[in-house]
Amino acid sequence: MPKYLAGPGGVAQGELTVPGDKSISHRSLMLGGIAEGVTDITGFLAGEDCLSMLRSLQAMGVRIERPEEQHVIVHGVGLHGLQAAAEPLDMGNAGTAMRLSMGLLAPQNFKSTLVGDESLMSRPMERAAVPLRLMGANITTHNGRPPVEIQGTPLKGIDYKLPVASAQVKSAVILAGLQAQGVTRVTEPAPTRDHTERMLRAFGVKISTEGPKVTIEGGQKLKGTQIQVPADFSSAAFFMVAGCLAASEKPLILRNVGVNPTRTGLLQLLLQMGADIKIGRAHV
């Protein structure tokens, strides 16, 4: 077993931009794919998880350009414009992509099969499948795990209380509700990240949040937009702590970090401990 020795540190100063937020990159691709018009994404996280989502959308007929590694242009096909893929959709190791895709594809008028790598094929998927089935979805898992087989069918809105707080399950139900008949309401037992809700509003969708309840009416169209994916807060966290601990004469500046209140628990804790952190305009 390898051993590591940590010695006294030096300075931690200068400027740094960490990679983009994976959750927002996933949702940017997915929502851009079902929007009408073009969605221009900068700051995209070009990691394998997000690229698995990108390739899956391409397999369903979405034209996607990549002028640069972190710059993606999605030509949306509209809410009902996706096409059946010729082969199973390989989500790699991306659990977020698989669970959100379950909600996205359950109301479509074709059959889909979702698979992944060895790790993803062992993860539970029933928590996302259960509420979707209550909406009328035809979803089959294998002992609760992938492959996930989806026979698209019309859905109806429901009122659903999440038994366990999960942003992924909440988002899957919201995406299904976006395409369902009637109104869908999701109530969560504890706050989770609300990227999906915020981003749907950016695409022109009316979605309301009242305390723990999220409400969306089906049939709304998305309009292509411009998205700047913020730097990932979790990736920035290590450097935030290092900057707080190091005895540096000059500051450490982390550029374009997303400070969604549902993700900044560490920031609040450091401030309570007396850390000298200044927050710029919607960024750390």
Please provide the spans of the model-predicted regions.
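Structural preference for solvent-exposed beta-strand-turn elements
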Residues: 1-281
